A protein has these predicted regions:
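Beta-turn initiation residues at beta-strand->coil junctions
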Residues: 2-8, 25, 31-37, 46, ...
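Short turn/helix-capping motifs enriched in Asx and small/polar residues
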Residues: 111-113, 535-552, 573-575, 581-583, ...
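Active-site or metal-binding loop neighborhoods of secreted/extracellular toxin and effector enzymes
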Residues: 749-831
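A motif-centric feature for acidic-aromatic and gly/ser/thr-rich catalytic loops and repeats
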Residues: 2-3, 8, 203, 293-300, ...
Length: 831
């Protein structure tokens, strides 16, 4: 199967633009090729589970990633091996199982034995379930993990993660209460220490306190405690923090309006307060504080009115000065930013154009073709600092030329045109950038997670990274000339050259040398605009270009590294990269350096495009693209951001969303038909944010809810019975609503047109026809709720029924009857 994006229409090159898929006789995906990348191979066992895979970079090294399952179908071991292609292909003839043996035997001495012969296996992940017998195994015994006192049947109890870039491992264990909530977690650290988290819950499952103890191999220890308070609606109202023997600090205090929207934030016992205002559509319109204020305009203000949620203009004031700064914005018909015109004063007519940022064009894949950027050129002068022309090989950047003759003054951002060659950038078989001659980068090496492990510069300087097998950054090492700086990330404790220097908090950080608190004051995108100390004094002021570059007028912006979107900025040796966790971002070019892991949900967009060309309205929150709202023990509505992974959450609604994601993803991979893809996309994609709330009336998606961010309303035991008798589980219903959310986020204009009532005589709307005939059929089939050739329905009718669980399509007759008595069940348009 071929998917040909818009770029193919102008340049019909399958290798550069096409998405290519091949399936076996069981309709399982066995071959996948992304644009500009080498193909990936997938191999399944007789139980239709993925047991081997291989991308282009792994093929160069003759490596095959492998997956071993237990008898319950849970992944117990992941790693890479050197099996021959012929041997790997025979895996489909058997069911690959991992058996837990006694003692330090098997794969990486984990105790697991695989029924498949693995040649030179290198283990990356080991998972233990149900019991704590692993405590005495190799590696765990050194950390004195305690025995569990409550049954953990069905739960992940322990894990081993390798550290990519070293020979070490991270050992961890989770302990549960009788309600299957994690009450204690222990994890070893890369510096030889240990982190322990102990959580106390309210009756409703909300955390009341979290006690964190951190130690390292030198004997240093730190203890901190968070205490949480909620109002009658279970909304978080107070967060207190204490570390070591220091006095407790009221870190955060929240107040809400009558609609449940955040109205006021206070920091550090009220030394700094921020007020928020909204319009009738719940879109944020202003942030007001003494050190930072911002007004956002949509249909009013100085720019061209935008009625679709785009911000037409914004004005802000930061720090101690009284200068009003701002931009008015212009967008094209695809909601991509084309021009940001800077000005000062209340109507932005003073000092105009000083910091403009203009995108001079996009290609059909939304790759930026050119950028004009103005900035400060001397102590008193301003002018054009970048006039970029960008050329591509498919979606991959080939070269950049800068026609501007001015350079930026001070500490601002601009593009450094280091060379003038036909090919200034190179990429590997997975689409990762391996060379940037303009930054004098000769080589970038990547690990098997497509995360950078080593950057080598022309002058001999080196930056290296250490990650665990989940992709969490553990260490950064900068070798700049004769100076070496090692930064260790031990949870929220930051070390530099072995010395603990910072303790990150929910509102900023503590400098450990003087025990002082520092707070981030943020704008609507989570950009850190101002840093204030515990007395409310301004320590840092940051002003940003729309795509994230720092303006030269920023003040003391080297105080701390967390800037745009709250992400860590590395400026050493001219790197100027933001670390978003899954990928690195270059704000001077408005591009990523690696392929979007969810690019297959955005065929019309380049996998390197940042925020779909709209950095004013969209953010990349570390992949935490699903924000799940729930009521905690105090009845307060709080949120939990989830980006995937095998996580157990104490709140039952949050856990049900996680279960739906895991179920849809696993069955979609097993079926190889694209089932569950919408659920996976909204959870894992780095460019979108979707809220999930517990339904009261019906399962649905509302694009105007949650300040215009959109919200899925869903209940974990509400399935859907069609008029032909077919029942879809709540998990399948969730994917239906996720597809609506995904279309709203990625194809807004068409979504708004197609969801008009009456636009389709059979399915009520064209949008419902698209979802019902597409993702609903795939997910229902993948989840075993419909057979091959069978359809869920041929209309938009459906009746809510109570099922026996998130993943069940078996109707609970008694509860359904009770529900129907209360609600007078009717055939509705949702789900």
């Amino acid at each position: 199967m071929f998917v040909l994006p818009p770029g193919y229409q102008d340049y019909p090159d399958l290798d550069l633009y096409a998405y290519i898929y091949r399936y076996d006789y069981l309709d399982r995906l066995v071959y996948k090729k992304l644009p500009g990348c080498a193909p990936s191979y997938l191999v399944y066992d007789a139980a239709h589970r993925l047991v081997f895979s291989q991308d282009g970079c792994q093929r160069n090294d003759s490596l095959w990633p492998f997956f071993v399952y237990d008898v319950y179908g849970r992944v117990v071991v992941e790693g890479e091996c050197s099996n021959s292609d012929k041997h790997v292909r025979t895996a489909g003839e058997t069911v690959v199982l991992g058996t837990l043996m006694e003692g330090d035997t098997g794969l990486a001495y984990s105790g697991y034995q695989s029924s498949s012969d693995l040649v030179d296996p290198c283990v990356y992940v080991v998972n233990y379930y149900d019991t704590y017998d692993f405590r005495t195994r190799n590696g765990f015994s050194a950390y004195n993990f305690p025995e569990g006192t409550v049954s953990a049947i069905g739960n992940l109890t322990g894990s081993i993660l390798c550290t990519h870039g070293s020979s070490g491992f991270i050992y961890s264990a989770d302990y549960y209460d009788i309600n299957k909530r994690i009450v204690k977690s222990l994890s070893s650290r890369v510096n030889g220490g240990m982190d322990t988290y102990a959580t106390e819950y309210s009756f409703q499952g909300s955390p009341l306190s979290v006690l964190h103890t951190h130690t390292d191999s030198s004997g240093y220890s730190l203890t901190e405690r968070y205490t949480y308070t909620y109002d009658h609606s279970s909304r978080l109202t107070r967060v207190s923090h204490q570390y070591d023997n220091n006095p407790s600090v009221l870190l955060l205090e929240h107040a809400y309006d009558e609609l449940g929207r955040l109205q006021t934030d206070k920091l550090d016992n009220g030394i700094y307060a921020t007020d928020y205002a909204y319009n009738i559509r719940n879109w944020l319109t202003s942030i007001e504080g003494s050190k930072f204020s911002q007004s956002l305009h949509y249909t009013d203000g100085l720019g061209v009115p935008c009625y679709n949620g785009n911000i037409s203009s914004m004005v802000w004031k930061s720090g101690e000065d009284d200068i009003m700064r701002g931009y008015h914005f212009t967008y094209d018909n695809l909601n991509r930013l084309t021009n940001a015109v800077y000005g000062e004063g209340s109507v932005l007519v003073q000092n105009q154009n000083r910091f403009n940022e203009q995108v001079t064009g996009y290609d059909k894949m939304s790759n930026i073709l050119g950028i004009k950027r103005s900035g400060q050129t001397s102590s008193t002068g301003y002018g054009l600092i970048d006039d970029l022309a960008m050329s591509y090989n498919g979606n991959q950047l080939k070269s950049v030329s800068d026609r501007a003759t001015n350079s930026v003054y001070g500490n601002g951002f601009d593009f450094k045109d280091g060379v003038n060659k036909e090919a200034e950038y190179e990429y590997d078989e997975n689409g990762n950038m391996t060379k940037d001659l303009n930054k004098k980068i000769l080589n970038i090496q990547y690990n098997c997670l497509n995360l950078p492990s080593r950057i080598e510069f022309e002058n001999g300087h080196v930056i290296s990274y250490l990650y665990d097998a989940d992709g969490i950054k553990l260490r950064t090492t900068h070798i700049i000339g004769s100076d070496t700086t090692v930064t260790d990330y031990c949870g929220n404790v930051i070390y530099e050259n072995g010395i603990p220097v910072k303790l990150l908090t929910e509102a900023g950080y503590v400098t450990l040398a003087d025990s002082k608190y520092h707070y981030f004051v943020q704008d609507h995108l989570g950009n850190n605009r101002v840093v204030v100390d515990q007395s409310g004094n301004v320590e840092e002021v940051n002003h940003y270009y729309p795509f994230g570059g720092l303006l030269s007028s920023s003040v003391s912006n080297a105080v701390q590294p967390y800037k745009y979107n709250g992400k860590e900025l590395d400026r050493k040796n001219g790197l100027d990269w933001y670390d978003y966790g899954a990928r690195m971002y270059d704000a001077a070019l408005g591009r990523w350096h690696a392929v979007d892991p969810m690019s297959e949900k955005y065929y019309s967009w380049s996998p390197y495009t940042y925020c779909m060309g709209n950095p004013i309205n969209h953010i990349d929150p570390d992949g935490n693209t699903v924000v799940i709202w729930y009521n905690n023990d105090a009845g307060k509505k709080v949120s939990y951001s989830y980006s995937g992974g095998d996580i157990t959450h104490p709140n039952s609604f949050v856990q049900s969303v996680i279960t739906a994601y895991q179920y849809n993803k696993a069955n979609g991979l097993k079926a190889g038909n694209g089932g569950g893809a919408s659920t996976v996309a909204i959870v894992e994609n780095t460019n979108i944010k979707v809220n999930v709330m517990e339904a009261v009336f019906e399962n649905s998606y509302n694009p105007n809810a949650a300040r215009g961010a959109g919200s899925i309303y869903w209940k974990s035991n509400w399935g859907s019975q069609k008029d032909n008798g077919i029942v879809n589980s709540p998990a399948t219903v969730f994917d239906h609503e996720a597809d609506h959310a995904l279309e709203h986020k990625t194809n807004t204009q068409e979504y708004e047109v197609n969801r008009a009532r009456g636009s389709d005589s059979q399915y009520q709307t064209k949008e419902e026809r698209r979802v019902i005939t597409g993702s609903e059929q795939k997910t229902s089939r993948a989840n075993g709720e419909t057979r091959s050739g069978q359809v869920t329905r041929r209309n938009h009718n459906g009746k809510t029924v109570i099922t026996k669980g998130v993943t069940s399509n078996v109707i609970d007759r008694q509860k359904t009857q009770e529900y129907e008595k209360r609600n007078k069940a009717v055939w509705t348009s949702e789900p």
